[in-house]
Every structure is written in C-alpha cells, then in structure tokens.
Amino acid sequence: MVVEVEQNHNNNGWKPSGLMVTEAAWWVYVYSPQAFIAVEVNRLKRYLDINNQIKKMTFARWSNNPSRGYLLLPEDVNKLLSSDLYDEPTE
C-alpha cells in the first residue's frame, strides 16, 4: 500500500498532497476491484508519526507528476489495522 504525501507537478517544487491535504475522515486504498481497506485518516497519520523510521520514497520519478510517499508492506498494514497503539487517545 502506498500513501502519498507530496507531489512535484510539472517540476514546480514539492508540495503537500494526498494524506497531508485530505479533508476526508477515511483513507481508502483499493487493492483490486473486489478488495479494499478503509482506515481513519488520523489513525494512519498516528501510525506514520510513531513509525517515523519508515523511509519516504519517490514514485514516478521521471514523470511530469512524481510523488513521494510511504510504501507500507502487508505486515505494516496489518499492524496499522490491528494494534491499539494507533487508536484515538482517550482522556
């Protein structure tokens, strides 16, 4: 699963995109026409903050709209979805 956080449209400089600018409450990633996951945006952001050793990668580097983001492997997605470490903090 790739989570985009920046893009460089037409080489105009890197700007926040994707997860960093969404106003949605849920982040949906479609694996295939019959398979997808939905995760609360704040949970995904907490996951990336806590797991800050995950390196940001550049995708479509040579296109006119390259992006940067995080490649989450299946074991990462499993932790994101199942660990209470990423639950909304309670007061």
Residue ranges and their predicted role:
Residues M20, Y29, D49, L72-L73, ...:
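Compositionally biased amphipathic helical and low-complexity segments enriched in hydrophobic
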Residues W27-N65:
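Domain-level recognition of nuclease-like catalytic cores that cleave nucleotide substrates
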Residues K55-E91:
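Charged phosphate-binding loop/patch that engages nucleotide di/tri-phosphates or the phosphate backbone
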